[in-house]
């Protein structure tokens, strides 16, 4: 008897690649077509109803937007570039993803297999280019295994919370492979279970907190799900809270015992308290300036909670470490304590925060004088929805947004945290609106950062992404100019540039826009922008002064360390006549100033 043979069905390898992406929940990706990536473009065209191609105007924007996808959602972001320059243009965004530990997949075009290693047009050995940025970096060598390679790349990106790069010779996706041979492992992928907090370690940590005279809780984005526990522990034990800048908003900015963040992108109360604390509890924190700033020189006990064993003891010698989830560990601490009476340390910090916030409000509420960033950010706060998302570029805008944006746990904000590449504002806003179309999205950028990716305002228009873009124009790289003031011996160099009228740039890509240079213009213009952004993107170009924001890391307020003339000059320059140092409130509540004691080098 002759068995009837079933006819084998085939599928294009490129179609299988797209189906693997779909299986992992990818619903859009970014890039620019090229001859070496056209086979993937062909497959995308066939699946356009299920996965959307977003055409950016520079591959860098695609990679930055993919990184922003991952930062906002936790899901993998995907971008692509053609062989040679298309792929290398992705690098800034890929490094941003690597440094902020988020999963991104980059597909790189390559000349067909018959022309590889022949010095053909735009053909080169691409693997070494991506060796540093990627946790997984391979070139596909045959069509049959191509879907598996893509699946493996995604699993590795998730597992390592980093970048995966796959170079794809252009002929492979057009080849037929057996339809039953490809699969995606998305439905079987699992994240590791987080360790439970060790009871004895939690007890020791709790006892140390209770014995402290000047305790401080310093949390990072690893505590993103523990906002309620952080605030409750702070209230119960009367411990002030401070965060890294990326963790802003985990606890509402309005919380009276929230001090802000430290170092330079900082708020004054945080820097001052950190220098005085005797016990610091690090929660999900990888503060990158600990070693260079000597932030913990008066710290007697350093405590740490983290899910990553590599982080324990990384930034400071740690006395008690708990390898566990932040939320569970904080809940375990709360279970061991009861509410304490107010302490002098607690009262001094509350008073210092109140004084600092009054200073910030005095800048924001000015009704006359030249337009400054502070009044513009007040206008942003006025029209912001409770769950607004902010994509913030890099530079002085980080420092000012850190101080003047009023965030709660309902908000999200993203920037390039550790890599700190300029130009991320526009790409991040594109990603935010694609992922959360129902939420209000702001792009906040200085003119330096905005000029790096301004061509992709056109992408917002093309895909009808109603972003409110606010550009802070002062014709300088302000953050670097301020550094030069502190470090250089000679005049400023390379930090000032000619004006760009961003309202005209926006008009050129068919986006409604405004240009303002007076405080009194802000209310009406921002209300108009909010109305426009119900349906389409809009841009406000705010021409502001080049004033340096108050340097919280270089305070001249305390008579123990600064002359009366220096203090007066500092207050005049930064409009800070009523601003007081923490030492004023320490003295008021009967505490010594450890920071300024002669010979004080720790406990």
Curated annotation (Swiss-Prot):
Designated name of the protein: Pyruvate oxidase
Subunit note: Homotetramer.
EC primary class: oxidoreductase
Entry superkingdom: Bacteria
Matches recorded under PROSITE patterns: TPP_ENZYMES
Free-text cofactor note: Binds 1 FAD per subunit.
Region: Core, residue numbers: 1-191
UniProt keyword Metal-binding present: yes
GO molecular function list: magnesium ion binding; pyruvate oxidase activity; thiamine pyrophosphate binding
InterPro entries listed in its UniProt record: DHS-like_NAD/FAD-binding_dom (IPR029035), POXB-like (IPR047211), Pyruvate_oxidase (IPR014092), THDP-binding (IPR029061), Thiamin_PyroP_enz_cen_dom (IPR012000), Thiamin_PyroP_enz_TPP-bd_dom (IPR012001), TPP-bd_CS (IPR000399), TPP_enzyme_TPP-bd (IPR011766)
Domain statement: Each monomer is divided into three domains, each of which contains a six-stranded parallel beta sheet surrounded by alpha helices.
Gene3D superfamilies: 1.10.10.940, 3.40.50.970, TPP-binding domain
Function noted in UniProt: Important for the aerobic growth. Decarboxylates pyruvate in four steps. The energy released is partially stored in acetyl phosphate.
Reaction(s) catalysed (UniProt annotation): pyruvate + phosphate + O2 + H(+) = acetyl phosphate + H2O2 + CO2
UniProt cofactor(s): FAD; Mg(2+); thiamine diphosphate
Disulphide bridges: none
E.C. no: 1.2.3.3
Keywords, alphabetical: FAD, Flavoprotein, Magnesium, Metal-binding, Oxidoreductase, Thiamine pyrophosphate
Matching NCBIfam families: pyruv_oxi_spxB
Region (Thiamine pyrophosphate binding): 343-603
Family, similarity comment: Belongs to the TPP enzyme family.
Positions contributing to Mg(2+) binding: 447, 474, 476
Location of region: FAD-binding: 192-342
Originating gene: pox5
């Amino acid at each position: 008897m002759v068995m009837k043979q079933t006819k084998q069905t085939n599928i294009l390898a490129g179609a299988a690649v797209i189906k693997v992406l779909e299986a992992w929940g990818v619903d859009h990706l970014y890039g620019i077509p090229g001859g070496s990536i056209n086979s993937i473009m062909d497959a995308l065209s066939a699946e356009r109803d299920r996965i959307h191609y977003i055409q950016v105007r520079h591959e860098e924007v695609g990679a930055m937007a993919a990184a922003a996808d991952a930062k906002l959602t936790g899901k993998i972001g995907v971008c692509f570039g053609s062989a040679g320059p298309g792929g290398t243009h992705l690098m800034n965004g890929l490094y941003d993803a690597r440094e902020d530990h988020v999963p991104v997949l980059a597909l790189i075009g390559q000349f067909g297999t018959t022309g590889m290693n022949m010095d053909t047009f735009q053909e080169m050995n691409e693997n070494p280019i991506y060796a540093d940025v990627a946790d997984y970096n391979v070139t596909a060598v045959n069509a049959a295994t191509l879907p598996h390679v893509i699946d493996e790349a995604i699993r590795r990106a998730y597992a390592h919370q980093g970048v995966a790069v796959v170079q794809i010779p252009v002929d492979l996706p057009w080849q037929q492979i057996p339809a039953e041979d490809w699969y995606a492992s998305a439905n079987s992928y699992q994240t590791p279970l987080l360790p439970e907090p060790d009871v004895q370690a939690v007890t020791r940590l709790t006892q140390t907190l209770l014995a402290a005279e000047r305790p401080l809780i310093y949390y990072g984005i690893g505590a993103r799900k523990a906002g309620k526990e952080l605030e409750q522990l702070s209230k119960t034990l009367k411990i002030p809270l401070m965060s890294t800048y990326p963790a802003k908003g985990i606890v509402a900015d309005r919380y009276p015992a929230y001090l802000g963040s430290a170092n330079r992108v900082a708020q004054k109360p945080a820097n001052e308290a950190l220098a005085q604390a005797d016990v610091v509890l690090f929660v999900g924190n990888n503060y990158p300036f600990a070693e260079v700033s000597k932030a913990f020189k008066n710290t007697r006990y350093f405590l740490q909670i983290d899910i990553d064993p590599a982080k324990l003891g990384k930034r400071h010698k740690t006395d008690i470490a708990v390898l566990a989830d932040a939320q569970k560990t904080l809940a375990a601490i709360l279970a061991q304590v009861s509410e304490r009476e107010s302490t002098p340390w607690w009262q001094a910090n509350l008073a210092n925060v109140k004084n600092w916030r009054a200073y910030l409000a005095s800048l924001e509420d000015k009704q006359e004088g030249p337009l400054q960033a502070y009044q513009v950010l007040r206008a942003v706060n006025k029209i912001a929805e409770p769950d607004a998302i902010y994509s913030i570029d890099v530079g002085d805008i980080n420092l000012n947004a850190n101080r003047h944006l009023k965030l709660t746990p309902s908000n999200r904000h993203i920037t390039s945290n550790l890599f700190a590449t300029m130009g991320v504002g526009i790409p991040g806003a594109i990603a935010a609106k694609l992922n959360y179309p129902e939420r209000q999205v702001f792009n906040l950028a200085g003119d330096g950062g905005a000029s790096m990716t301004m061509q992709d305002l056109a992408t917002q228009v093309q895909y009808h992404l109603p972003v409110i873009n606010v550009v802070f124009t002062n014709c300088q790289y302000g953050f670097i100019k301020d550094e030069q003031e502190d470090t250089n011996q000679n005049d400023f160099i390379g930090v000032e540039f000619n004006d760009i009228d961003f309202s005209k740039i926006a008009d050129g890509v068919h986006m409604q826009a405004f240009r303002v240079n007076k405080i009194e213009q802000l209310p009406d213009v921002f209300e108009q922008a909010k109305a426009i952004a119900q349906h389409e993107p809009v841009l406000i170009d705010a021409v502001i002064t080049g004033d340096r924001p108050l340097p919280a890391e270089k305070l001249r307020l305390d008579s123990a360390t600064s002359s009366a003339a220096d203090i007066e000059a500092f207050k005049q320059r930064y409009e800070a006549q009523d601003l007081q140092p923490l030492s004023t409130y320490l003295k008021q509540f009967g505490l010594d100033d450890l920071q300024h004691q002669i010979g004080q080098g720790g406990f």
